[in-house]
A protein has these predicted regions:
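Glycosyltransferase donor-binding loop in the core domain
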Residues: 11, 80-83, 125
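Short, well-ordered beta-strand elements within core beta-sheets of diverse protein domains
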Residues: 76-83, 152-156
Length: 182
């Protein structure tokens, strides 16, 4: 399902991709894409692209750990994050096999506590996703133990039906801009 649907979404979103690319490049110096090192299936590292929403000199830590994260946003960054359009380039990662459409969100390489807890519960064996059960149940504001609990619940219930439910809930949350902190 990932290859077919991910490829179709990548093609259909082409014009939007170009528009976002241009908006990032025209509103702030630096590349349009930001590549972050993420933890994938079996704890292997991979590069995950997003449209750049933060200034080039932003420290490489999770946004919620920054002091005054808003001061690092680019002029278009808040809009891209609120609409989740910054995630659009991850369709390339789905096509490459680094990501699934649905699965636990990949941890940053330096989120040792999240990686350790996921490994303890076996969640590391899943291909990470663009969206997941934890994201539709809280997105940015979840504490790590609760996030891993949702990841574990997803692992136990994983099916096409559950994935489709998560995709629909994700679209609803994005349209309502629920759970976006920065």
């Amino acid at each position: 399902m990932d290859l077919a649907l991910g490829g179709m979404l990548l093609i259909l979103s082409g014009p939007l991709f170009v528009l976002c690319w241009a908006a990032v490049r025209l509103t702030s110096p630096g590349p349009a894409l930001h590549w972050s090192e993420r933890v994938g299936k079996d704890n292997r590292l991979f590069g995950m692209p997003k449209f750049r929403t933060m200034r080039v000199n932003t420290p490489q830590i999770a946004t919620h750990l920054l002091q005054q994260p808003g001061r690092y946003l680019t002029p278009i960054g808040a809009l891209l994050r609120k609409t989740s359009l910054d995630e659009l380039p991850q369709l390339v990662s789905v096509w490459r096999g680094d990501l699934s459409l649905v699965g636990p969100r990949p941890a940053l390489f330096n989120q040792d506590d999240l990686v350790a807890l996921r490994t303890h519960h076996g969640v590391h064996r899943l291909v990470p996703g663009i969206t997941g059960w934890a994201q539709v149940n809280g997105r940015d504001e979840l504490e790590i133990p609760l996030k891993v609990r949702f990841d574990t619940e997803y692992m136990a219930a994983q099916s096409l039906h559950v994935d489709l439910k998560i995709i629909m809930l994700t679209l609803w949350r994005v349209l309502k801009a629920e759970g976006v902190q920065h």
